[in-house]
Amino acid sequence: MAFIKILSFLLITQIIFSQKIPIIIDADTANEVDDLFAIVGALTEPKFDIVGITTSQFHTSPYATNNTPLESKIINDNILSLLNYKSIPSLMGHNLPISSLDSITNSEASDFIIKKAKLFSKINPLTIIVLGSCTNIASAIINDPSITKNIKVYYLGFFHDPETNYYNLNEFNTRNDPIAVDFLLNNKDLDLTVMSATTSKNLVFKRSVVFSKLMEFDELGFYLIKRWNSYKRWWTELDKENKKWTMWDVALVEAIANQDISFKDLFDTPVLNTRRKINIYTKINPNVMTERYWKKINFYMNRLNHE
């Protein structure tokens, strides 16, 4: 009887780990350029099952309108259409950051996260990839703490020195909702992994290479080229011609998909937060990551064009 139980457990475990990773992407897509490339990479990743895409606010940007989540949803919907994934839910998140942990309201995004998380478990968790502010995922957990055990959160944010364990929280995503970030860091029950800006900045795409590849992808390619060409960086005077782009968000998505070329370690949280361990990526292989990124997209687009 004991042998049968062990065998059953091993079979269940094998099935779970051979399945695609169920993922919700939470992104501030309209904020920049790299989000678009990250979402395309996630949607074409054979190891992923994208459960839905939600949008997060980026109110600190000088380009921010009165409804940044709506801006991002429009772009997300366009990408889903271009990749023939119209059936994937696309939802809007909170328009403002959390002002107090005692007055949290839900949004379409946080409601969706709660609903989907309840379908998973600790042994078969739902992965939430946060590419912008942490408003939606924090709101979801605060409103229904029971989902914490059913999810893994991957966050793209803040700077971190792995040698000294020094944190610099003066980073765009973190500034857009510092209360939400603190809540995640302080939550001892939450499985949290961070792709720091320090590590992700090493993934850089060159325009000449990117455009030559995108020209093969018809409408999707032209859509991404237009975004690259039309966006003007507000945070730097360097590279005004947009010859290169740091692919912060792509680094996180591809790190999850390619664990053999992305390396993380356990670190104590910042000194002002509840003391616990979180995972932080310390190194990636940008060259291999870039090669695999384009290879899978090319494979998907070729298959799509022949359907």
What do these predicted ranges mean?
Residues 1-20:
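Bacterial Sec-dependent N-terminal signal peptides
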Residues 19-307:
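N-terminal acidic, glycine/proline-rich low-complexity segments
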